Design a protein with these regions (language model features):
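Beta-strand cores of secreted/periplasmic/IMS beta-sandwich domains, seen most often
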Residues: 43-67, 97-106, 110
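Extracellular/periplasmic metallocenter environments
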Residues: 20-25, 39, 88-131
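Bacterial N-terminal signal peptides
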Residues: 4-14
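A mature extracytoplasmic/lumenal domain signature
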Residues: 37, 51, 59-61, 69-73, ...
Length: 131
């Protein structure tokens, strides 16, 4: 019983510290990423490590398009309300659809690509560089 009380007390003490580590999402830098048929714009996405960013994705095509970067999203701290969008490392957008995702990127070089094989073969890939 005493051990359970100690564990509960430790949890209560750690909760405010965890809340303080959340980024200030309102100050996030905004970056637009366009999904065109067979390409992303920009092809190289440059972000600052440890700084919150709001990524605005827009499907500028005439068909469903996707953006997959599983390792990037897994390494980044994604805002809690946006995690459902990248549950499997990416998402799909219908023509004209928009999606914004706030995250704190981890340093590294990451690869993004379409979830559709034909689109990947035609060059629908991008690099994400976080320094």
């Amino acid at each position: 019983m005493r051990l359970a009380l100690l564990a509960f007390a430790a949890l209560l003490l750690a909760a405010p510290a965890a809340a303080q580590r959340q980024p200030e999402w309102r100050t996030a830098t905004e970056v637009d990423i366009l999904l065109h048929p067979f390409r992303y714009e920009p092809r190289t996405i440059r972000l600052r490590a440890g700084q919150p960013v709001l990524l605005h994705f827009v499907n500028d095509g005439f068909a469903n398009l996707s953006f997959r970067a599983p390792r990037f999203f897994a390494a980044s701290l994604v805002r809690r309300s946006d995690r459902r969008h990248v549950r499997n490392g990416g998402f799909r957008l219908r023509p004209g659809e928009r999606l914004s995702i706030a995250l704190m990127p981890a340093p590294g070089h990451w690869r993004a690509r379409s979830g559709y094989l034909l689109h990947r073969l035609r060059g629908m890939t991008a690099r994400i560089i976080v320094e």
